[in-house]
Amino acid sequence: MSLMDPLADALTNIRNNELQVKDSCVISPASKLIGEVLSTMQKENYIGNFEYIDDNRAGQFKVELEGNINKCGVIKPRHAVKKDEFEKFEKRYLPAKNFGILIVTTPEGIMTHYEAKERGIGGRLLAYMY
């Protein structure tokens, strides 16, 4: 298996384990980006706790699943979004208004599109989930 996009592989792993109604999953390899995305998902109650496991290679994340994810995935290409353009991408990737989140990387860190709208900053879209 080739790892061209570790974030896409991580979200696919989470989605597949959610569909199989499993309690937890292991994401490998670990990275700072995946850790930040997982912490954003945890703040929004899509997943439970997660922990980093050092396996003397690339590391792993063990994620507790809550069963709250219907669908999740990465957004490719990583669209640059201005602070007033989020609604266009909400219509494209989310099923209804105020249902689900877009995960955005901004100069202030990784956050949901709701937080980015409140702060009045733009960024690049990484992922969606609902």
UniProtKB/Swiss-Prot annotation:
One of the record's GO molecular function terms: rRNA binding
Organism encoding this protein: Methanobrevibacter smithii (strain ATCC 35061 / DSM 861 / OCM 144 / PS)
Top-level lineage group: Archaea
Family, per entry: Belongs to the universal ribosomal protein uS8 family.
Subunit composition and interactions: Part of the 30S ribosomal subunit.
Protein name: Small ribosomal subunit protein uS8
Function in brief: One of the primary rRNA binding proteins, it binds directly to 16S rRNA central domain where it helps coordinate assembly of the platform of the 30S subunit.
GO biological process: translation
